[in-house]
Amino acid sequence: MINEIKTDAKDRMTKSVDSLKSHMSKIRTGRAQPALLDGIMVEYYGSATPLRQVANVVAEDSRTLAVSVFDRSMIQAVEKAIMTSDLGLNPSSAGTTIRVPLPALTEERRKDLIKLVRAEAEQARVSVRNVRRDCNADLKALLKDKDISEDDDRRAQEEIQKLTDSFVKLVDDLLAAKEKELMEI
């Protein structure tokens, strides 16, 4: 029973950190990253389709993304989708490739992005702590029902606390790395 609770805690905490990584990868830094365009949907034969399914996105250099559209007739639709996204990008097409130059980030925009990243990290920390709280409540219920001893309860709570601390440290490390990346010019 205790092992199931610990395994569940680790799985849920891992999902929280993975979610944070996913959110952080979508936050634009000064560097061109293909993941930046992951959230863009393109109108494809009457339905909204993720950009990744109609085109290949690669970093051409540190400031330019190259989008290779699979179907030539989709070039205008892809270009329009990138332009109308809230990323503030101005793509230009050249044959079957669309080049997306990334403008340099202003100091004000960098600070806004850092605030956003810190809020995301805090949300991940809260999520990890909520998992700990749920697990401790499960342990208390087992203790109350006399399914585990007080020593087992205390030991399990300490192990869950260590797990929580390691995941919170991981969140803090991710935050520090992203802040450093955002402040690079």
Swiss-Prot record:
Looking at the Swiss-Prot or TrEMBL record, what is one Pfam family this protein matches? RRF
Presence of the UniProt keyword Protein biosynthesis in the record: yes
Respond yes or no to whether keyword NADP is given for this record. no
Q: SUPFAM superfamilies this protein is in? A: Ribosome recycling factor, RRF
UniProt GO cellular component terms: cytosol
Q: Give the record's keywords alphabetically.
A: Cytoplasm, Protein biosynthesis
Q: Which GO terms describe its biological process?
A: cytoplasmic translational termination
Q: Which Gene3D superfamilies match?
A: 3.30.1360.40, Ribosome-recycling factor
Domain of life according to the entry: Bacteria
For this chain, one GO molecular function annotation is: ribosomal large subunit binding
Q: Where in the cell is it found?
A: Cytoplasm
Role: Responsible for the release of ribosomes from messenger RNA at the termination of protein biosynthesis. May increase the efficiency of translation by recycling ribosomes from one round of translation to another.
As for family, the record states: Belongs to the RRF family.
Name-wise, this protein is Ribosome-recycling factor
Origin species, per record, is Tolumonas auensis (strain DSM 9187 / NBRC 110442 / TA 4)
